Amino acid sequence: MSELSDITEKYYDSDDADRFYYHIWGGEDIHIGLYEEGDSDIRVASRRTVEAMATKLNHWPGGTRLLDIGAGYGGSGRFLIKEHRFDVTSLNLSKIQNQRNREFNQLQGLCSQHLVVDGNFESLPFREATFDLVWSQDAVLHSGNRYAVFEEVNRVLKPGGEFIFSDPMQRHGANATVLDPVLKRIHLASLGSFETYDDFRKKLGWENLGVTDLTPQLVNHYAAVRANLEGRRKELSGVVSEAYIDQMIRGLDHWVEAGKARVLAWGIMHYRKP
């Protein structure tokens, strides 16, 4: 495992991080949401993102094999099982999140349709041409070698298979001074970009099925998470440490400021392997 992967795993496996993402960020869904005017409900907005991505897969029949990389608590996988009857495998680095994922599956009677695997998406523990679809939400940014992730996705996808994912990214030519506090918080030298991921796609010979730029939602989401965290601070006393809350608020402020300064981007990308 790379040093960055080790740092990421330790962070998400910490008690504070687990409790924060479970209680504040969105429960089963811990990714950026789609907000409507006047709406600040994180869980509802996060589920809208899942629904928006899932509609792009309506042409795939029940029984389709889907791999979710960086799956978090597995909320997207359970949605796809229930609504699309897909056979889902969730791969994730955090063992704590994976345990919660398995518990959710047990409670909802989905264990036989939803396999949860401890693993790193830079080295997927699956044979070539195993999956019809690969799905990911706001996870690829954590890789120190994003092209390796794309190569692994290409390897495990069947011919004609599709990769659909969202990711927080940086704008081409982004102001380093504004971007740097965001990168330091997540221990990265850079983020991906629409251009970078399109270059990866071209290098692998994939078809572009559509890219949706939803950048304003990034600011909406981080602002909503910050407001929710501030509003529930007393409630979280004894659940999440004060030091973690203070650190998280500072980090969320950096994301909001960078988003407003137009150095960040977020969207949904959808590609097909030939």
Language-model features: where?
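N-terminal auxiliary segments of SAM/dcSAM-dependent transferases
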Residues: 1-21
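Conserved Class I S-adenosyl-L-methionine
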Residues: 210-274
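Conserved alpha-helix/loop element of class I SAM-dependent methyltransferases that forms part
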Residues: 27-36, 40-62
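A short glycine-rich, Lys/Arg-flanked "PGG" loop and its adjoining helix->strand segment in the class I
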Residues: 147-162
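Class I SAM-dependent methyltransferase SAM/SAH-binding core
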Residues: 65-68, 73-123
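A short acidic, Gly/Pro-enriched loop at the edge of an enzyme's catalytic core
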Residues: 122-133
